[in-house]
């Protein structure tokens, strides 16, 4: 009986570490963005990085109007912008597409001033046929 207890106590930290690695934590992930330019008559798919995953959060069962409640979401901590220039566009067409590239991620309150705080669609979009 004592041997089983010692083995369980020694395995507990290893099991806890394995469990935390198996969760989908907030991290960089590769995504594809489909961009269509009707003016330029072309459609491309851009590969970039974004932030995705779960963040630890707690929601109180009792909701009080005096206590603000928010949940942490997986957000960009640092990012840069890159541009793609469509080829073969008419002279006055807007041929440049600028998109964000995540460099690092963090769990924080979503800032709706700079972020679309809705859920990211899991559907792969494709260009419309002309």
Curated annotation (Swiss-Prot):
Carbohydrate attachment residues: 30
Pfam family, one: Cys_knot
Superkingdom field: Eukaryota
InterPro entries: Cystine-knot_cytokine (IPR029034), Glyco_hormone_CN (IPR006208), Gonadotropin_bsu (IPR001545), Gonadotropin_bsu_CS (IPR018245)
Gene Ontology biological process: G protein-coupled receptor signaling pathway; ovulation
Keywords per UniProt: Disulfide bond, Glycoprotein, Hormone, Secreted, Signal
Disulfide bridge positions per record: 26-74, 40-89, 51-105, 55-107, 110-117
Signal peptide: 1-18
A single Gene Ontology CC term: extracellular space
Keyword Manganese belongs to the record: no
Any one GO MF annotation of this record: hormone activity
SMART domains in the cross-refs: GHB
Localization per Swiss-Prot or TrEMBL: Secreted
Physiological role: Involved in gametogenesis and steroidogenesis.
Assembly information from the UniProt record: Heterodimer of an alpha and a beta chain.
Family per record: Belongs to the glycoprotein hormones subunit beta family.
PANTHER family: GLYCOPROTEIN HORMONE BETA CHAIN, LUTROPIN SUBUNIT BETA
Protein name according to UniProt: Gonadotropin subunit beta-1
Organism field: Cyprinus carpio (Common carp)
Lineage: Eukaryota, Metazoa, Chordata, Craniata, Vertebrata
């Amino acid at each position: 009986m004592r041997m089983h207890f010692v083995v369980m106590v020694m395995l507990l930290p290893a099991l806890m570490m394995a469990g935390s690695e198996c969760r989908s934590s907030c991290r960089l992930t590769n995504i594809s963005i489909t961009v269509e330019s009707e003016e330029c008559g072309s459609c491309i798919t851009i590969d970039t990085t974004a932030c995705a995953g779960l963040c630890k959060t707690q929601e109180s069962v009792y909701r009080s109007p005096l206590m603000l409640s928010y949940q942490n979401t997986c957000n960009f901590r640092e990012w840069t912008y890159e541009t793609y220039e469509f080829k073969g566009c008419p002279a006055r067409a807007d041929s440049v597409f600028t998109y964000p590239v995540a460099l690092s991620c963090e769990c924080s309150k979503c800032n709706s001033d700079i972020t679309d705080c809705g859920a990211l669609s899991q559907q792969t979009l494709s260009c419309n046929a002309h």
